[in-house]
UniProtKB/Swiss-Prot annotation:
Similarity comment: Belongs to the sorting nexin family.
Biased composition (Acidic residues): 35-47
Main location: membrane
Skewed-composition ranges (Basic residues): 1-12
Keyword Zinc-finger among record annotations: no
Gene name for this UniProt entry: ATG20
Record function comment: Required for cytoplasm to vacuole transport (Cvt), pexophagy and mitophagy. Also involved in endoplasmic reticulum-specific autophagic process and is essential for the survival of cells subjected to severe ER stress. Functions in protein retrieval from the endocytic pathway.
A GO cellular-component term linked to this record: cytosol
Extent of Polar residues compositional bias: 60-76, 204-218
Protein name per its UniProtKB record: Autophagy-related protein 20
Binding site for a 1,2-diacyl-sn-glycero-3-phospho-(1D-myo-inositol-3-phosphate): 319, 321, 345, 395
SMART domains per UniProt: PX
Residue span of region Disordered: 1-76, 95-138, 203-222
Organism: Candida glabrata (strain ATCC 2001 / BCRC 20586 / JCM 3761 / NBRC 0622 / NRRL Y-65 / CBS 138) (Yeast)
Swiss-Prot/TrEMBL domain comment: The PX domain binds phosphatidylinositol 3-phosphate which is necessary for peripheral membrane localization to the perivacuolar punctate structures.
Length: 753
């Protein structure tokens, strides 16, 4: 081993001296010329290459080889070719240097060729990685030589240095790609093509054995052929990277274009996505639930009740005024639709006064719920009194159904309004509404908005007259009055309005009477409690052993419990749905009133148009008459110059002074003659404007009649009748259940006798 080191040092000194001589001899060679091969240098390089396998000073050896070769392209290429051929001829197995392979990142292999690659990394690459510097070939810059490269060690390679440098680009490409072991979708039967796949086989021998099922000898021979082929056809590996970069850039542009197309498609299909909200919420069960209601005070302002809404896994806090604002916006955005109702704005104090006459007005929640709202899931704050709890539960019920009905509505859910309302990021709903440009553009009065699209209100709609809603419209429909036929009901509005009024009367009366029954049953329940307590006290005072009083006490207790269950069902499952039905009828009435006011609006426009036309005709006739009678002007002027007769004096000095002052004022006023032509021109412009307004209003009225009278109101009436049938069926079921239980209780008393 010592001999080998001495011979290596000697050869190193000899090679360095020869290299200096060769460098001095090549100074005058022009750039791009070829250098003749030096057999002595190649023989010494081969001998020195064999000694590299038994030494650790590899960095200095590579530098010596580069100094000997002089850095020219042809010398480096031939040196590498012979150096690789000598390594392949030896075909000796050497133990793998584990430390070197860990630094480079390659997998260990028993193949001699792969060991040579690892040694190449140890000699020339790993040492330079520590300094993080660039490896540059010493010599002249030859433009015709493709082997002269100056690149960074981290991911780039200088060509023509060693066998490891020759395969470095492919190794780097392998390490950055997904290997077969890492790819779960790899097809083992697919043929491997290209140098990249062969490089993957070199770095993953186990994977190559499983997929291609070849022995180690075949892989060794294949690797040797690959090294020889690459050494013969050496080219710049950076060109491959440039081609791949171009492909990546092209793919990036394609992906960007596809993303833009996808974004445009998503915007175009936003409405269809909103239409799927209804089916999505039903399948996923992501409906709105109000989980808590409690009093909240912000700063020094008065307290209010906040409702904590859970939707899609998030919690948002809203107050009653926020719900009221949301519904007012929906009424403006969808003027031809029945918007679900919300409870009337009623203070807690006023509601408490209204129910103050009821003894024990608090009702226990029933064991069963007839609709989708489960009030048992809503927590009422303990700071709320029993009298205030009823109105809070009432609001929780109606507001929950209000939001769920909005989500189930296809047209409303196609917009982002409901999602914005339920978004916890919009903590202050009032600020969100005032900062929205869409809401600020809406007209204050929906009678001056475009009924088809309120966000696209025209100048004609903005100038429409607003009827007075406080004035009674009378028995006759204004639209029928305009048509001139009171029996004309082509749209079915009169019959529809009568049907709605009949349904509204039934619901109101049913709610009023059932509320009275519920109140009486609630009082009867407390009477049963008093009777049970009286019989219990009587049984304690009875000297005899007669247990009849005890039986009466137990029976009245059971009847009280059954009555309490009945009262709870009647209040929450009958009275509350009936009250909600009244709210629904009010929403339909509001929609019918909108249709009627639009009819009055059209009537006013038509009436104003007819009056202006008559006035224009009168002026035109008067002008023609003046032209035919020229003396008429002199008569009018003489009449104008004639003194105004003095008014008859009234009795008393006070009235005489007033008359004198009035006469002086009349004499001082000069009567200016009107320009008939200007007046006619103004009337014609006004008539044109009214005709345009009449045409737009008539067209809107047709849309309103088709939507309200033929779709919305009939659908609402049909749903209301179905709800009323379900309510009455539940009412009969509750009464029947209570009657059966109460009958069994008293039958047991009769049998005991």
């Amino acid at each position: 081993m010592g001999r080998s080191k001495r011979s290596k040092k000697k050869s190193l000194a000899h090679l360095q001296s020869d290299g200096k001589d060769k460098l001095s001899s090549e100074e005058n060679i022009s750039r791009g010329s070829e250098v003749e091969e030096s057999p002595e240098n190649f023989e010494e390089a081969q001998d020195y290459g064999d000694s590299l396998k038994d030494t650790d000073e590899q960095s200095d050896s590579i530098t010596a080889i580069r100094s000997v070769t002089g850095g020219t392209a042809s010398t480096i290429t031939d040196l590498n070719n012979k150096f690789k051929s000598q390594e392949l001829v030896d075909n000796e197995k050497v133990e793998i240097n584990t430390k070197s392979t860990e630094e480079v990142g390659c997998k260990p292999s028993t193949d001699h060729s792969t060991e040579a690659l690892d040694e190449g990394h140890d000699t020339g690459i790993s040492s330079t990685n520590k300094d993080d510097s660039d490896v540059r070939i010493i010599g002249d810059d030859n433009e015709d030589s493709e082997a002269i490269e100056s690149v960074d060690i981290k991911g780039k390679v200088s060509s023509g240095i060693s066998d490891a440098d020759v395969l470095k680009p492919q190794e780097e490409l392998v390490h950055t790609a997904i290997l077969e072991n890492d790819n779960p979708f790899y097809d083992a039967n697919k043929e491997i093509s290209g140098s990249k796949k062969l490089d993957e086989k070199v770095n993953s021998v186990d994977s190559m054995a499983e997929t291609t099922k070849v022995n180690s000898g075949d892989s060794k021979q294949r690797m040797g052929d690959l090294v020889v082929r690459r050494s013969e056809n050496l080219h710049n590996p950076n060109l491959d990277y440039e081609e791949e970069d171009e492909i990546l850039v092209s793919n990036t542009d394609t992906n960007k274009h596809s993303k833009e197309s996808s974004s445009a498609l998503n915007n175009a299909n936003m409405k269809s996505f909103g239409n799927a909200v209804k089916s999505y919420t039903k399948k996923s069960g992501k409906h709105v639930r109000i989980l808590e209601a409690k009093k909240v005070s912000e700063g020094q302002s008065r307290t209010f009740v906040a409702y904590f809404i859970k939707y899609n896994g998030h919690m948002v806090r809203r107050r009653y005024s926020d719900f009221e604002s949301l519904r007012s916006i929906l009424v403006k955005l969808f003027p031809l639709m029945v918007i679900p109702p919300i409870p009337e704005k009623e203070g807690l104090k006023s509601y408490s006064k209204a129910i103050a006459g009821l003894k024990h007005a608090k009702y226990i929640l029933p064991s069963e719920q007839t609709d989708s709202v489960d009030l048992s899931l809503s927590i009422i704050d303990q700071s709320v009194s029993d009298k205030e709890e009823n109105i809070i539960r009432h609001r929780v019920r109606i507001l929950t159904k209000f939001l769920n009905r909005l989500l189930d509505n296809t047209d409303i859910s196609s917009t982002s309004l409901i999602e914005d309302f339920l978004n916890p990021n919009n903590s202050n709903w009032n600020d969100f509404v005032t900062s929205s440009a869409t809401f600020s553009m809406l007209p204050r009065n929906r009678l001056q908005a475009n009924p088809v699209d309120p966000t696209n209100t025209t100048r004609v709609h903005a100038c429409l007259p607003i009827p007075n809603t406080s004035v009674a419209l009378g028995k006759r429909d204004p639209e029928l009055f305009v048509s001139g036929n009171e029996n004309d009901d082509t749209d079915g509005y009169i019959l529809l309005e009568k049907e709605h009024k009949r349904y509204e009367s039934i619901v109101n009366n049913t709610y009023k009477y059932n509320r009275r029954i519920t109140k009486n049953f609630n009082e009867m329940k407390h009477d049963y409690d008093d009777l049970a307590a009286a019989f219990a006290e009587l049984s304690n005072l009875d000297i005899s052993s007669n247990p009849k009083h005890v039986d009466f006490c137990a029976t009245f207790d059971k009847s009280s419990i059954a009555m309490q269950a009945l009262v709870s069902n009647l209040y929450y499952n009958i009275d509350e749905p009936l009250n909600e039905a009244i709210y629904n009828t009010n929403a339909v009435t509001e929609l019918l009133m909108f249709r009627k006011l639009k009819a009055v609006q059209l009537y006013k426009v038509e009436k104003s148009l007819v009056g202006k036309v008559h006035e224009l005709q009168k002026l035109e006739k008067g002008e023609n008459k003046i032209e035919s009678e020229p003396n008429q002007e002199s008569l009018t002027s003489a009449r104008r110059l004639s003194p105004i007769p003095a008014p008859q004096k009234l009795g008393g000095s006070f009235f005489n002074k007033i008359s004198e002052i009035a006469n002086k004022v009349k004499e001082s006023v000069s009567y200016q003659e009107l320009d008939v032509e200007t007046q006619i021109s103004n009337l014609r412009k006004e008539i044109e404007r009214l005709k345009e307004t009449s045409a737009v209003t008539t067209k809107d009225m047709e849309v309103i009649n088709d939507t309200i009278c033929k779709e919305e109101v009939p659908k609402a009436l049909k749903c209301g009748e179905k709800e009323l049938e379900d309510i009455l069926a539940s009412y009969a079921s509750y009464m029947k259940t209570y009657a059966k239980q109460n009958l069994e209780y008293w039958k047991s008393i009769q049998e005991a006798r």
